[in-house]
UniProtKB/Swiss-Prot annotation:
Physiological role: The RuvA-RuvB-RuvC complex processes Holliday junction (HJ) DNA during genetic recombination and DNA repair. Endonuclease that resolves HJ intermediates. Cleaves cruciform DNA by making single-stranded nicks across the HJ at symmetrical positions within the homologous arms, yielding a 5'-phosphate and a 3'-hydroxyl group; requires a central core of homology in the junction. The consensus cleavage sequence is 5'-(A/T)TT(C/G)-3'. Cleavage occurs on the 3'-side of the TT dinucleotide at the point of strand exchange.
Cofactors, names only: Mg(2+)
Active site per UniProt: 8, 69, 141
Originating species: Xanthomonas oryzae pv. oryzae (strain KACC10331 / KXO85)
EC id: 3.1.21.10
Gene name for this UniProt entry: ruvC
Record has Transmembrane as a keyword: no
Protein name: Crossover junction endodeoxyribonuclease RuvC
Xref: PANTHER family: CROSSOVER JUNCTION ENDODEOXYRIBONUCLEASE RUVC
Keywords per UniProt: Cytoplasm, DNA damage, DNA recombination, DNA repair, DNA-binding, Endonuclease, Hydrolase, Magnesium, Metal-binding, Nuclease
Length: 174
């Protein structure tokens, strides 16, 4: 059994999703939740909350591997910078506990789950619900975190079949 923590980083809310993968490659939902960072004081205090909150979650759920969504350039450079800083704090929380970090772009996650890199959030939420047999509507940040964990599980399974590491299994020749 392998436990994967998926992280959808954000400067206000960070999505957390945890799945277990059995020996047959089947995914099972373990936990999902947002880590709410608003109301934690200035931005540096939010980063501190993210670092400590993820650390506590890692200690509680003991994942074997971590998958995190890469930063994309959004509407403003300032927003992208804050998102990058939140992502950096999340990665620090993971590597401080000697866990491997695997990174996936949003388009790669959408492609892995829905079959097209331009899929919208509702399609991703729907597929996550189906794949993990979840009832009810998922919050976008939780769905994205679970989606990145599922993506890593798929890449991991492909890598094992091919006898390569996960980075080699996902990389494309340009």
């Amino acid at each position: 059994m392998t436990r994967i923590l998926g992280i959808d980083p954000g400067s206000q809310r960070t999505g957390i999703g945890i799945i277990d993968i059995d020996e047959g490659g089947r995914s099972r939902h373990v936990h999902h939740a947002p880590l709410i960072l608003l109301g934690e004081g200035d931005f540096s205090q939010r980063l501190k909350r993210l670092l400590h909150g993820l650390g506590e979650l890692i200690e509680t759920y003991r994942p074997d591997e971590v998958a995190i969504e890469k930063v994309f350039m959004g509407k403003s450079a300032a927003s992208a910078l804050k998102l990058g800083q939140a992502r950096g704090a999340a990665i620090c929380a993971v590597v401080m506990r000697d866990l491997p970090v695997h990174e996936y772009a949003a388009t790669e996650v959408k492609l892995a789950l829905v079959g097209k890199g331009g899929a919208d959030k509702l399609q991703v939420q729907h597929m996550v619900g189906i794949m993990l047999n979840l009832k009810g509507k998922l919050q976008p940040d939780a769905a994205d975190a679970l989606a990145v964990a599922i993506t890593h599980a798929h890449v991991r399974a492909t890598a094992q079949c091919l006898g390569v590491n996960t980075q080699q299994a996902w990389s494309r020749k340009k």
